């Protein structure tokens, strides 16, 4: 029997494991390794690692269109991609404590009032609700454990030997800092790291020199303002995506829009801070705010991953919080920046001040963005024309970033590497940028694994089976 290891317990890896055990694959042959914690021990602030990854700790919105969130249809066609999306959405409903509250918004018509300045991408979105993601995670995790799936939590994979099917990992727990590495052997590997593992995927790409496709830089800000300024558009498209493209190939889009009970969230990746957003379901969380990312896609930059990391480091600062404590004991905060013509830094859904250093001028941000911030300036100015009450009643948290390393070229039938047919890449490791696409890629790979496993089992029954 084949030992399968999944590196990354995010949406892609978890959906893959679920598809496998649902169809009889022995759970005791599946091992999942993740830097984070199980859903019972994962804290709200741990948004990047842990069961269901960043996607399962986000805004709880599942986009339902093949043109959004990364590649799926290019591998399997439109019809199959939508079938896989349905399966991802079904899984979230299946483990949801109140599945009847999962609803779909499906805007149909682009309003005339935005057309002079923006395009509006219209597509269906399933709303799971941030409030329920934790319970979904617990239910889903319990199911996989009940099927025999083994998890290695708080372990970081630092090397993979494709030739010998060997994974090297080490505990990230401080009390085990001096312990030796652990090793796990596999017959088949699903590499399903999230954003916090993109640097490791890049390292593997360079080590094994597998062919890749360059990806553009994706970086910008998290924009926040009172919801009433955008209500006219929200009534048409709840999760609106404004879009602009320029002649030099640079494009901008708003994305991950949160309304009603909308909060800016802090993400920590590679020791630096960036921002995202999420929305709560409960009326007790209502703050009548809207936030969304304004993200630039910049093609043609050499080493886009390194370029993005350097920019993020430039707009991260360590500063002393004004909490009445002086001297060496004064608390220090490492964060990104916050700029607003009129507003103060917001609070989290837990009522705590968002970690962001207020600045009086965007000049240091413009310098760090090396001239590209002018596109965001223009985007905001045009929003003020489309939404005339907006004026100076807004703020931006800097930066928001989607780390993308060069995308490995894979076999379209099973997402395996060209020279390593037992190694599959899925999720952020394959440039997925959304929950639905990540989950769909995981299920797609699982279907391939199941096909091989069932064929192998049949051959064994006939007395002719040997290896996959």
Language-model regions: role of each:
Residues 2-66, 106-468:
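Residues forming the flavin
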Residues 50-103:
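Dinucleotide-binding Rossmann-like beta1-alpha1 core, especially the glycine-rich loop
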């Amino acid at each position: 029997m084949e030992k399968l290891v999944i590196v990354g317990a995010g949406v892609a890896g978890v959906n893959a494991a679920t598809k496998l055990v649902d169809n009889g694959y022995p759970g005791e042959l599946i091992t999942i390794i993740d830097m984070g914690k199980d859903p019972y021990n994962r804290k709200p602030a741990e948004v990047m690692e842990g069961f269901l990854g960043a996607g399962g700790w986000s805004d709880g919105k599942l986009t339902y269109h093949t043109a959004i969130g990364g590649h799926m249809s290019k591998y399997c066609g439109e019809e199959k991609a939508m079938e896989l999306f349905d399966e991802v959405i079904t899984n979230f409903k299946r483990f949801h404590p109140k599945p009847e509250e999962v609803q779909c918004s499906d805007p149909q018509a682009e309003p005339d009032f935005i057309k002079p300045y923006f395009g509006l991408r219209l597509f269906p979105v399933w709303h799971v609700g941030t409030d329920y993601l934790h319970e979904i995670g617990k239910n889903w995790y319990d199911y996989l454990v009940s099927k025999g799936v083994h998890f290695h939590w708080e372990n970081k994979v630092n090397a993979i030997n494709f030739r010998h099917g060997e994974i090297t990992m080490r505990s990230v727990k401080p009390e085990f800092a001096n312990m030796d590495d652990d090793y796990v052997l596999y017959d088949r590997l699903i590499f399903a790291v999230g954003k916090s593992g993109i640097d490791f995927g890049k390292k593997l790409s360079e080590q094994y020199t597998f062919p890749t496709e360059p990806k553009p830089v994706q970086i910008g800000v998290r924009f926040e303002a009172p919801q009433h300024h955008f209500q006219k558009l929200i009534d048409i498209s709840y999760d609106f995506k404004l879009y602009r493209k320029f002649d030099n190939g640079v494009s901008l889009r708003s994305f991950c829009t949160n309304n009603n009970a909308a909060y800016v969230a802090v993400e920590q990746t590679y020791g630096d801070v960036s921002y995202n957003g999420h929305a709560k379901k409960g009326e007790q969380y209502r703050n009548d705010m809207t936030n969304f990312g304004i993200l630039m896609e910049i093609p043609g930059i050499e080493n886009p991953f390194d370029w993005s990391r350097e920019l993020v480091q430039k707009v991260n600062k360590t500063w002393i919080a004004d909490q009445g404590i002086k001297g060496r004991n004064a608390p220090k905060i490492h964060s990104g920046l916050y700029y607003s013509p009129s507003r103060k830094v917001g609070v989290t859904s837990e009522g705590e001040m968002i970690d962001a250093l207020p600045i009086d001028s965007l000049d240091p941000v413009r310098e760090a963005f090396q001239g590209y911030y002018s596109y965001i300036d223009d985007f905001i100015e045009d929003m003020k024309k489309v939404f005339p009450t907006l004026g100076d009643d807004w703020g931006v948290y800097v930066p928001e970033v989607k780390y993308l390393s060069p995308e490995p070229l894979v076999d379209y039938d099973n997402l395996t590497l060209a020279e390593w047919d037992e190694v599959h890449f899925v999720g952020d490791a394959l440039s997925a940028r959304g929950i639905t696409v990540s989950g769909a890629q995981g299920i797609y790979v699982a279907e391939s694994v199941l096909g091989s496993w069932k064929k192998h089992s049949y051959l064994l029954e006939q007395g002719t089976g040997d290896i996959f």
